[in-house]
Every structure is written in structure tokens, then in C-alpha cells.
Amino acid sequence: DYLDMVELVSDYPEMKATFNLTPVLLRQLEDFSNGAKDLYWYYTEIDADILTLDDKKFIISRFFDTNPKVIARFPRYVELRNSSQNSSSWTNQDYRDLQLLFNLAWTDPKYLAQEPLKNLVSKGRDFSEDDKFVLLNEHSKLIDKVIPTHAELWKTGQIEITTTPYAHPILPLIFDTNLASVGDIGAELPKNRFSKPTDAAIQVEKGLDLAEELLGQRPTGMWPAEGAVSQEVLGMFAKEGIKWIATGEHVLSKSLDIPTFKRNTKG
């Protein structure tokens, strides 16, 4: 979806949008582009004919980690899910099909409607090891396009990109754990108070540094992790050139001392 969403915006040149790309996500995308593999990728690559018992246990237990509505799009996937409780009778082909269908299910429908993945969807079952290679190769290509596509649209001015403090911290609590009681008077505070304003400032700086390194520009907007803000940390954003931040309405309503925001058909 990371690529699909920004490509959708590019299809409508008059449309403007803001995307938040966290440093954690950017670093993961960079790692994948440089050849890193997660466990799911690793277990997908293994030839189904040489899967060990432990390999099969992992695949059975984790390769149905998909929304049931998505699984329902693939008849063979449904068939495998329904028989997974009796996997002792599964063939190597069953495992191979599951390896591939799990990855197809996690692919945006836009790309499933395009070749070469369209052919795999049409095939539906009895996949080969070569089919797995085609799928994983296509996934690599999609991953490689995420950062450059965002950077290009940001350069043209059609989108703005914001980011988040580096390791996705709850920034006010890094600044001072006692700040938890500002938003929640009854909050249970830690016995040992933690307060590292310098660390909090570094989180902001490093997040912006990474975004600038990988995207070619330094963001002027930021989305604090979980929308967590406090008066004490606002100056840290401003010091780094941040002009605006995003958070939730409940934070604003508490700041304005009003119960909630009322909505009508116009918003």
C-alpha cells in the first residue's frame, strides 16, 4: 500500500496530499532494498521439497496471518486454510502453494491486476518454484520504488512528507515521565522518575536527518509518535525548523478545556 497510495495521488495531478514516513519505516525499506530479508521472506524462498518439520510448522502457523476477507479472494488459499488442521497429510505442493498465496494476499490488488502477478493469480494453484521467484522479484521491485516515488512527488510539490521522531518514542515521556500526569491526572507514574530532554531532542533531530538523507529534503512538518505532545517538547520541533505538527482532536479538546468536538454533515 505504501507505493499504491502515492501512485494513486500521482494519477490526479491537481490533488494534494501529505504522507508521513517514519524513520523506522524508511530504514526498513532501505534495508530491504539492500538485500535484507525477514522471516516470512526466508521461509517463502525455501524450496518446498526440502522443508524441514520446523519449517513446515512455521509456515502452517504463520502463513495464514491474513485478513479472512483477503483469503476469501483466493479459492486455493481457502482450501488450504480449511485443511490446515490436518496438515500431516499435506503434500509438498500444498506447502508451495501456501508459500506463494500468502505473499499474493499481502500484495496490493493494483499490482495483482498487472503482469507478471496477474498470471499467478489466474493460475491459482499448483505453483512452481519459478513462480515464487517471479513473485519475490516483483516484491523487490515494488519495495525499491517506494522511497524514490515519494521523493519525486515531494520534489514536484504535489505532496508534502512529514516524519516522526527517530525511534517512534512517546516524546513527552522521554522529556519527563512526570508529564504523563498533565494529560491524565490519575496516571500511575514510575517510582523512578525518568527525564532526558537531550535524548528527546536527539530523537527529533535524527528523524529529520534520516528523512533528508533518503528523500532529498528536510521535512518542515512532523507527526509525533501516537500524537503525543506537550508544551515542553514543542520548542524542540521549532528549533529543528518544524513549522507544524499533527496530533489528535482529543489533545486539542483537552487543551481548550472543552468536552469534545461536535460533528455535522459538513464536518
Residue positions per predicted region:
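Carbohydrate-active enzymes and regulators
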Residues: 1-267
